[in-house]
Amino acid sequence: MAKKAPRRTAQRILEVTLDLFNRFGEPNVSTTAISAELGISPGNLYYHYPAKDALINTLFDQYEEALNGLLQASDSVHNVEDAWFFLHTLFELIWEYRFLYRDLNDLLSKNRRLETHFQAVLHRKEKAVHTMLEGMQQAHALLPGTETRAALPTTATSMVVVLTYWLSYEYVRDPRHALEPGNAHHALLRGARHVLNLLEPYLEATQRAHLQALAQVYAPTAG
């Protein structure tokens, strides 16, 4: 049992660090604060994670691994209902690691490894969303023709921009409450709806009607 203690301690450090980063923002959380929250010495924290960047990088690695798994589902999206679920699932993961998006520019300016990995993440997101759109067109959920197909790359990029910066927008709207756990449900619904709204001009009539129906269902909470 004793041999497993360091592994449990390391995982507990990550869990508490993620919670503190999400609540207060990474720049506002010191390793001393993390140690105090855990009730361990700074030396014990240093033994497992010798620098704050080590914590950030490990949390990002967890996020990246989970994201890669979710993005693989993009080729299973064939209609608005599938797209809504796919995007909401992505937003749920972004919410779980929301400190990365809340403090994105600051983190990238200080961490070269994070900078290069996040660029790769954006590329994979765009590729996955483009795959989703192609699947929807092949399933006749999107309007046929060269005009729609020509618009897919730009639309995919626009969707990824909203997906990436939606929580920053929520935070600016209400800095004191937007990123609190109790607001997750509404924030994620709003995000999914606004990303899908970018598709509306290209949706086949019944799919457009279904998107509008979804928007009405979630109108009281989706904003």
Which residues fall in each region the model found?
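Short, Lys/Arg-enriched anionic-surface-contact patches
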Residues: 2-10
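Amphipathic alpha-helical packing segments from all-alpha helical-bundle domains
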Residues: 114-141, 150-168, 186-201
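N-terminal positioning helix adjacent to the helix-turn-helix/winged-helix DNA-binding module
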Residues: 9-16, 155
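Helix-turn-helix
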Residues: 12, 20-58
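Hydrophobic alpha-helical connector segments
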Residues: 72-99, 120, 124, 156
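Secondary-structure edge/capping motif, primarily at the C-terminal ends of alpha-helices
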Residues: 71-75, 101, 105-108, 140, ...
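C-terminal peripheral helix-coil segments that are non-catalytic and often amphipathic
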Residues: 157, 168-223
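Short, basic, alpha-helical segments at the C-terminal edge of helix-turn-helix-like DNA-binding modules
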Residues: 61-67
